[in-house]
A protein has these predicted regions:
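Juxtamembrane and boundary regions of transmembrane helices in multi-pass small-molecule transporters
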Residues: 8-38, 144-158, 201-221
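Short helical (or helix-break) motifs at transmembrane helix termini and adjacent helical loops
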Residues: 23-27, 171-187
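Transmembrane alpha-helices that form the ion-translocation and gating core
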Residues: 1, 107, 111, 116-119, ...
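Short, small-residue-biased leader/transition segments that mark boundaries at the very start
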Residues: 2-6
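Membrane-embedded hairpin module used as a gating/binding unit in multi-pass transport
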Residues: 16-89
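The feature identifies polytopic integral membrane transport proteins across all domains of life
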Residues: 7-13, 92-96, 131-132, 156-169, ...
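Entry/N-cap segments of selected transmembrane alpha helices
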Residues: 13, 17, 119-146, 198-202
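Hydrophobic transmembrane alpha-helices of secondary-active transporters
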Residues: 81-84, 102-124
């Protein structure tokens, strides 16, 4: 398995990529799209019923338990938090989870990762290679998302085109990737709001990456 040193290096690299989303993604998005594509206006998202909102985390949690149990620590928390919010009967718990609790956990996680990473361990060739590999995967994921939308548009009707600027949101940096879609879209059309469209692939990216990681861990363990 991965040693503690590599785990710390990977954790620091992951946080670095999250912070670098506004730097890495916009040039790739502009490079791979035309001005016409950036101006595509999408239909408003459909209204989701309360029943669907409640059933989604329940079904997702059950499928994770059966199919990818090793991904449960991450996806379980995602679905549990979603259920707290959407159920409508645990408002105080939902407010605590998305406010004081997540702030406390974020501080403790940052302190733990930072305190356990010494310069002598982190500033090594292995660390640089890990960071470079992660950055490359980040770039490939961003480009792949944009290109996939462009390919998908080839088979869609004129009125159902998807703005390729939301393709970058498939990278599971929530909600930063979706915000970048919104910011770049507003640069070319101040009335074209892509945020809610981009949140779909953004959350799907979280679920997909966690499932993929769970499957990989299943093979390694």
């Amino acid at each position: 398995g991965l040693g503690d040193v590599y785990k710390r290096q990977i954790a620091v690299s992951a946080y670095s990529y999250m912070a670098l989303v506004p730097v890495i993604q916009p040039p790739i998005m502009r490079l791979l799209t035309t001005k016409h594509e950036r101006l595509i206006r999408m239909k408003p998202p459909r209204v989701v019923s309360h029943t669907e909102k409640v059933m989604f985390p329940i079904i997702g949690l059950l499928l994770t338990c059966f199919l990818v149990p090793s991904g449960l620590p991450l996806l379980g928390m995602l679905f549990f938090g979603n259920l707290l919010k959407e159920s409508g009967v645990t408002r105080r718990l939902a407010e605590t989870a998305r406010g004081p609790l997540i702030d406390t956990i974020t501080i403790l996680l940052g302190l733990t990762v930072g305190a356990s990473t010494q310069a002598s361990e982190f500033l090594t060739i292995d660390s640089i290679l890990i960071f470079a590999l992660g950055a490359l995967s980040f770039i490939i994921a961003t480009a792949s998302g944009v290109i996939f939308v462009k390919i998908f548009n080839l088979v869609l009707g004129k009125d159902n085109k998807i703005n390729p600027l939301i393709g970058n949101a498939g990278v599971s940096a929530v909600p930063d990737s979706a915000r970048i879609s919104q910011v770049i879209g507003l640069e070319y059309d101040p009335t074209n709001y892509l945020l809610m469209h981009a949140m779909g692939p953004n959350v799907a990216g979280v679920i997909g990456s966690a499932v993929a990681a769970g499957i990989l861990l299943g093979f390694l363990m």
